[in-house]
Protein backbone atom coordinates (compact mmCIF):
# COMPACT_ATOMS: atom_id res chain seq x y z
CA UNK A 1 0.00 0.00 0.00
CA UNK A 2 1.10 3.55 -0.71
CA UNK A 3 0.49 6.86 0.97
CA UNK A 4 0.39 9.66 -1.57
CA UNK A 5 0.99 13.28 -0.57
CA UNK A 6 -0.11 16.39 -2.43
CA UNK A 7 3.25 17.82 -1.39
CA UNK A 8 2.88 21.44 -2.49
CA UNK A 9 0.43 22.25 0.32
CA UNK A 10 1.20 19.66 3.01
CA UNK A 11 2.84 21.01 6.20
CA UNK A 12 6.32 19.64 6.97
CA UNK A 13 5.13 18.35 10.35
CA UNK A 14 2.44 16.26 8.61
CA UNK A 15 4.98 14.92 6.09
CA UNK A 16 7.25 13.92 8.98
CA UNK A 17 4.39 12.03 10.66
CA UNK A 18 3.54 10.25 7.41
CA UNK A 19 7.15 9.09 7.00
CA UNK A 20 7.22 7.90 10.62
CA UNK A 21 4.05 5.84 10.09
CA UNK A 22 5.34 4.50 6.76
CA UNK A 23 8.63 3.34 8.26
CA UNK A 24 6.81 1.62 11.11
CA UNK A 25 4.29 -0.10 8.81
CA UNK A 26 6.67 -0.68 5.88
CA UNK A 27 4.66 1.43 3.44
CA UNK A 28 5.77 3.44 0.43
CA UNK A 29 5.30 7.23 0.41
CA UNK A 30 4.97 9.11 -2.87
CA UNK A 31 5.16 12.89 -2.73
CA UNK A 32 3.71 14.60 -5.81
CA UNK A 33 4.50 18.27 -6.38
CA UNK A 34 4.30 20.90 -9.07
CA UNK A 35 7.74 22.19 -8.06
CA UNK A 36 10.79 20.84 -6.27
CA UNK A 37 10.16 20.34 -2.55
CA UNK A 38 12.35 18.94 0.22
CA UNK A 39 12.17 15.13 0.30
CA UNK A 40 12.84 13.22 3.52
CA UNK A 41 16.00 11.13 3.10
CA UNK A 42 14.44 7.68 3.49
CA UNK A 43 14.25 4.92 0.89
CA UNK A 44 10.49 4.54 1.42
CA UNK A 45 9.92 8.10 0.12
CA UNK A 46 9.77 8.98 -3.56
CA UNK A 47 9.30 12.48 -4.99
CA UNK A 48 7.58 13.06 -8.31
CA UNK A 49 7.70 16.59 -9.72
CA UNK A 50 5.05 16.96 -12.40
CA UNK A 51 5.23 19.51 -15.22
CA UNK A 52 3.81 22.82 -14.08
CA UNK A 53 0.27 23.55 -15.08
CA UNK A 54 -3.15 24.01 -13.60
CA UNK A 55 -4.00 20.94 -11.49
CA UNK A 56 -1.09 18.88 -12.90
CA UNK A 57 -0.25 17.37 -9.49
CA UNK A 58 -3.94 16.74 -8.79
CA UNK A 59 -4.38 15.00 -12.14
CA UNK A 60 -1.31 12.84 -11.47
CA UNK A 61 -2.66 11.79 -8.07
CA UNK A 62 -6.10 10.91 -9.48
CA UNK A 63 -4.53 8.96 -12.34
CA UNK A 64 -2.06 6.94 -10.23
CA UNK A 65 -3.61 6.40 -6.78
CA UNK A 66 -5.77 3.27 -6.58
CA UNK A 67 -8.45 2.04 -4.18
CA UNK A 68 -6.85 0.74 -0.99
CA UNK A 69 -4.34 3.60 -0.95
CA UNK A 70 -4.45 6.92 0.88
CA UNK A 71 -3.91 10.46 -0.42
CA UNK A 72 -3.09 13.31 1.95
CA UNK A 73 -4.44 16.57 0.51
CA UNK A 74 -6.08 19.84 1.52
CA UNK A 75 -7.70 20.38 -1.86
CA UNK A 76 -11.45 19.63 -1.59
CA UNK A 77 -12.11 19.22 -5.35
CA UNK A 78 -9.12 16.84 -5.56
CA UNK A 79 -10.46 14.84 -2.61
CA UNK A 80 -13.86 14.64 -4.33
CA UNK A 81 -12.25 13.18 -7.46
CA UNK A 82 -10.32 10.65 -5.35
CA UNK A 83 -13.35 9.59 -3.30
CA UNK A 84 -15.35 9.02 -6.49
CA UNK A 85 -12.53 6.71 -7.62
CA UNK A 86 -12.62 4.78 -4.33
CA UNK A 87 -9.33 6.18 -2.98
CA UNK A 88 -9.18 7.24 0.69
CA UNK A 89 -8.40 10.92 1.29
CA UNK A 90 -7.37 12.75 4.46
CA UNK A 91 -6.44 16.37 5.04
CA UNK A 92 -3.32 17.23 7.09
CA UNK A 93 -5.52 18.41 9.98
CA UNK A 94 -7.02 14.96 10.48
CA UNK A 95 -10.34 15.40 8.69
CA UNK A 96 -11.20 12.46 6.48
CA UNK A 97 -13.01 13.07 3.23
CA UNK A 98 -15.79 10.60 2.43
CA UNK A 99 -19.01 10.27 0.43
CA UNK A 100 -21.09 11.48 3.39
CA UNK A 101 -19.26 14.77 3.93
CA UNK A 102 -18.08 15.64 0.40
CA UNK A 103 -21.17 17.67 -0.53
CA UNK A 104 -20.87 19.85 2.57
CA UNK A 105 -17.10 20.22 2.20
CA UNK A 106 -17.48 21.31 -1.44
CA UNK A 107 -20.26 23.78 -0.57
CA UNK A 108 -18.19 25.39 2.21
CA UNK A 109 -15.12 25.55 -0.03
CA UNK A 110 -17.12 27.19 -2.84
CA UNK A 111 -18.69 29.70 -0.43
CA UNK A 112 -15.31 30.77 0.95
CA UNK A 113 -13.87 30.99 -2.56
CA UNK A 114 -16.70 33.37 -3.53
CA UNK A 115 -16.26 35.45 -0.37
CA UNK A 116 -12.49 35.75 -0.97
CA UNK A 117 -13.08 36.80 -4.58
CA UNK A 118 -15.48 39.51 -3.35
CA UNK A 119 -12.96 40.67 -0.75
CA UNK A 120 -15.24 39.67 2.14
CA UNK A 121 -13.01 36.96 3.56
CA UNK A 122 -9.26 36.73 3.74
CA UNK A 123 -6.54 34.43 4.87
CA UNK A 124 -6.76 30.71 5.12
CA UNK A 125 -6.56 28.18 7.88
CA UNK A 126 -4.92 28.92 11.20
CA UNK A 127 -1.43 27.76 12.16
CA UNK A 128 -0.57 24.06 12.13
CA UNK A 129 0.05 23.32 15.80
CA UNK A 130 0.15 20.42 18.23
CA UNK A 131 -3.64 19.94 18.22
CA UNK A 132 -3.68 19.62 14.43
CA UNK A 133 -0.69 17.25 14.44
CA UNK A 134 -2.35 15.02 17.05
CA UNK A 135 -5.68 14.97 15.18
CA UNK A 136 -3.81 14.08 11.98
CA UNK A 137 -1.77 11.32 13.66
CA UNK A 138 -4.92 9.77 15.16
CA UNK A 139 -6.82 9.87 11.86
CA UNK A 140 -3.83 8.56 9.90
CA UNK A 141 -3.45 5.62 12.30
CA UNK A 142 -7.18 4.82 12.11
CA UNK A 143 -7.36 4.99 8.30
CA UNK A 144 -4.17 2.97 7.73
CA UNK A 145 -5.48 0.26 10.08
CA UNK A 146 -8.78 0.20 8.17
CA UNK A 147 -7.06 0.04 4.78
CA UNK A 148 -4.72 -2.74 5.97
CA UNK A 149 -7.77 -4.89 6.79
CA UNK A 150 -9.00 -4.44 3.23
Curated annotation (Swiss-Prot):
HAMAP family: UPF0178. It comes from Pseudomonas putida (strain W619). Belongs to the UPF0178 family. CDD domains: PIN_YqxD-like. This is UPF0178 protein PputW619_5044. NCBIfam families: PRK00124.1. Signal peptide: none annotated. InterPro entries: UPF0178. The lineage of its organism: Bacteria, Pseudomonadati, Pseudomonadota, Gammaproteobacteria, Pseudomonadales.
Amino acid sequence: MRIWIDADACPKAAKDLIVKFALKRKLEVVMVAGQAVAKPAFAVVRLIVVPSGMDAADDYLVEHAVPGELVICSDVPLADRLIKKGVAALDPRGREFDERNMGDRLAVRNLFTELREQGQAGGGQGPYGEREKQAFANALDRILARLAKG
